[in-house]
């Protein structure tokens, strides 16, 4: 570029960040701190040292230290302040303390692992801290055989980046590459990934690139990681399109590749991409997806970036070469909301725009979205655009997930809101839909414990601010009562799964139904096909009955509390594929209240 048009050297894309053991018991340290002329590396333990780092023209400070291996504790000193490494792999004493060097010498047992085809994904979303009594990666491993028997093919973890204290959903993480110490740290996560792969299951990780948590967040002291040009619901936005944003982008792309390279992660669920403000011609999210796909090709593995997006914008799941962002799939909340209102009748908050009509659910089954440009009463504007794809694998659906459960006033699960027959109806509709189904931990046996919002901050003012914020979140809803205190440890304890329920007859029957539905989905060619162009629907809003034909398979769902008899619009000699009270005779289907049936021609 002409002189004066390039103020800073280009970001050195590809260089490793943080601390790395490079052999011979030597460590390389690197941090981007362009706001500082000098940075000091402070080796805290086992032998204290202070080392002046070398700064390059782009603001990267580097040092190589002898006699330095795994377990070395260190900080960076900037303007006299001791700060943990922004690219730390481990924060053993929390977000305000020193970082620890982690070596890469882990004995993997997944040689030859290439991943799971996206079409075969049956996702199980879990929160490590409440999934088991121990709340660790190792304890989660003990449950994997149950998930395998159930029919799960991909485990998805809520964020595991280091957060304050030991109780958090994970979205308050402040060290994006440091694995939560209380869960078992980096080696614990590697053991869990390895165990999943040995059972033929993928492991997905929820990552947060739209904000950092409020406690232990010292990133702005190092450089222009944030911008004041935009705001997010959680504070300042990350700088993905301003001056020096190339380096900020690399910091987060580096993190994504770290999960893939060092932890053998099979996919990244990218949190709230709609909250990432970026007006670049080539957005950060495109860079991210491109980097993930390139690394997948290099490794010969199936690795998928999956978006959480409430934009109903098909560009999110459109390939980069077709001018999209390049995500392989996205969460589809329209499915959840359409199903939820049918089952509960709730119409407040964001459910306002989802009247309890079976025709709405039918529309979602054909396109993935309900809103494709219509006016949304809740949003007060036109919303969404029609996808151009007929690939149902582009959409991840659920009847409940951590958001939809945890962001209720009392954190009630579906099994606590509805009678068992309606839970079974919802499960069948979801598992047999032409999309990628996702279960929320415990739903497979009808867990009734709540999943509530919990934190363990150390700042009294922040604790009170979080309490007030939670109260404000429920202003649009008609729920009555006082929200549980996020800081109360009992809120966290109440949210743990009760695995002993599995031995109860009612809950065991629910688990068996889930297993049978997943087996049916897996073994029936018409249900394995996720081609939306082959989906035919017949919705009767008055009778609240939905008929769906997928190839040679017929599905019938009765969302009313009355028995319904409906004339079949589809011809065929139908035989039942699953035990059900629903029957077909003389061209009519009879459905008891809240019943479903599955037949094949």
Model feature map: region roles:
Residues 1-28, 48-125, 130-135, 146, ...:
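The feature marks proteins involved in alpha-glucan
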Residues 285, 289-476:
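Conserved alpha/beta catalytic core and glycan-binding cleft of carbohydrate-active enzymes
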Residues 33, 70-72, 586-601:
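C-terminal beta-strand-rich structural cap/linker in extracellular carbohydrate-active enzymes
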Residues 31, 76, 126, 147, ...:
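Conserved, mostly hydrophobic/aromatic
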Residues 27-34, 557:
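Short edge beta-strand/loop segments characteristic of extracellular beta-sandwich folds
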Residues 29, 39, 559-572:
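Surface-exposed beta-strand/loop patches in extracellular or lumenal glycoproteins
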Residues 111-118, 127-298, 316:
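Substrate-binding/active-site clefts of carbohydrate-active enzymes
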Residues 13-15, 367-384, 439-440, 445-454, ...:
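Glycan-recognition and catalytic regions of carbohydrate-active enzymes
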């Amino acid at each position: 570029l002409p002189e004066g048009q390039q103020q800073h050297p280009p970001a050195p894309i590809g260089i490793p960040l943080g601390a790395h053991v490079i052999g011979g018991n030597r460590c390389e340290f690197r941090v981007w701190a362009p706001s500082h002329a000098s940075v000091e590396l402070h080796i805290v333990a086992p032998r204290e040292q202070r080392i002046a780092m070398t700064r390059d023209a782009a603001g990267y400070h580097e040092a190589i230290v002898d006699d330095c291996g795994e377990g070395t504790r260190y900080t960076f000193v900037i303007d006299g302040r001791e700060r943990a490494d922004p690219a730390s792999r481990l924060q053993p004493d929390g977000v305000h303390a020193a970082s620890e060097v982690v070596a890469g010498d882990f004995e993997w047992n997944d040689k030859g692992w290439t991943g799971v085809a996206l079409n075969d994904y049956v996702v199980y979303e879990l929160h490590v801290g409440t999934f088991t009594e121990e709340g660790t990666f190792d304890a989660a491993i003990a449950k994997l055989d149950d998930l395998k028997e159930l029919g799960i093919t991909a485990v998805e973890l809520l964020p595991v980046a280091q957060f304050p204290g030991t109780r958090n959903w994970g979205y308050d993480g402040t060290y994006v590459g440091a694995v939560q110490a209380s869960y078992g740290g980096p080696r614990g996560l590697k053991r869990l990934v390895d165990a999943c792969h040995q059972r033929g299951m993928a492991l997905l990780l929820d990552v947060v690139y739209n904000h950092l948590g409020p406690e232990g967040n010292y990133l702005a002291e190092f450089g222009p990681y944030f911008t004041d040009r935009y705001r997010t619901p959680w504070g300042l936005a990350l700088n993905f399109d301003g001056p020096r944003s190339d380096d900020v982008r690399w910091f987060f792309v580096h993190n994504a590749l770290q999960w893939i390279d060092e932890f053998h992660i099979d996919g990244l669920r990218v949190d709230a991409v709609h909250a990432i403000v970026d007006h670049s011609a080539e957005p950060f999210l495109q860079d991210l997806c491109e980097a993930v796909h390139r690394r997948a090709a290099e490794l010969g593995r199936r690795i998928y970036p999956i978006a959480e997006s409430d934009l109903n914008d098909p560009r999110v799941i459109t390939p980069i070469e077709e001018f999209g962002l390049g995500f392989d799939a996205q969460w589809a909340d329209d499915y959840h909301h359409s199903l939820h209102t049918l089952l509960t009748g709730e119409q407040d908050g964001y459910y306002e725009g989802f009247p309890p009509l079976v025709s709405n659910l039918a529309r979602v089954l054909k396109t993935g979205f309900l809103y494709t440009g219509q006016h949304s009463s809740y949003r007060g504007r036109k919303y969404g655009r029609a996808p151009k794809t007929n690939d149902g694998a582009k959409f991840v659906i659920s009847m409940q997930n951590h958001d939809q459960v945890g962001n209720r006033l009392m954190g009630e699960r579906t099994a606590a809101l509805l009678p068992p027959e309606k839970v079974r109806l919802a499960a069948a509709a979801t598992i047999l839909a032409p999309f990628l189904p996702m279960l929320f931990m415990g739903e497979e046996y009808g867990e009734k414990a709540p999943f509530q919002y919990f934190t363990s901050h150390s700042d009294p003012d922040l604790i009170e601010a979080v309490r007030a914020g939670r109260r404000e979140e429920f202003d649009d809803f008609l729920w009555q009562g006082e929200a549980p205190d996020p800081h109360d440890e009992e809120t966290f304890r109440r949210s743990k799964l009760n695995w002993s329920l599995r031995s109860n007859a009612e809950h065991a029957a629910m688990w068996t139904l889930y297993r049978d539905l997943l087996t049916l989905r897996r073994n029936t060619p018409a249900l394995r096909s996720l081609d939306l162009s082959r989906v035919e629907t017949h919705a009767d809003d008055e009778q609240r009955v939905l008929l769906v034909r997928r190839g040679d398979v017929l599905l019938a769902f009765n969302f009313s509390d009355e028995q319904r008899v409906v004339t079949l619009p589809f011809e065929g000699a139908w035989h039942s594929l699953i035990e059900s009270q629903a029957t077909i005779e003389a061209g009519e289907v009879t459905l008891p209240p809240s019943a479903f049936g599955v037949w094949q021609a």
